[in-house]
């Protein structure tokens, strides 16, 4: 899980979602693409 000021999609499988006020990126194809804004 990367914590970044600005989260971006890194591949076409990445999805940007918002959970409890935190913007996250989840990726089914590449778990290393997981990010959250912070």
Curated annotation (Swiss-Prot):
GO cellular component, one term: cytoplasm
GO annotation terms (biological process): translation
Alphabetized UniProt keyword annotations: Ribonucleoprotein, Ribosomal protein
InterPro entries: Ribosomal_bL36, Ribosomal_bL36_sp
GO molecular function: structural constituent of ribosome
PROSITE patterns, alphabetized: RIBOSOMAL_L36
UniProt xrefs under Pfam families: Ribosomal_L36 (PF00444)
Keyword Ribonucleoprotein: yes
HAMAP family: Ribosomal_bL36 (MF_00251)
Similarity remark: Belongs to the bacterial ribosomal protein bL36 family.
Name this protein carries in UniProt: Large ribosomal subunit protein bL36
Gene that this sequence comes from: rpmJ
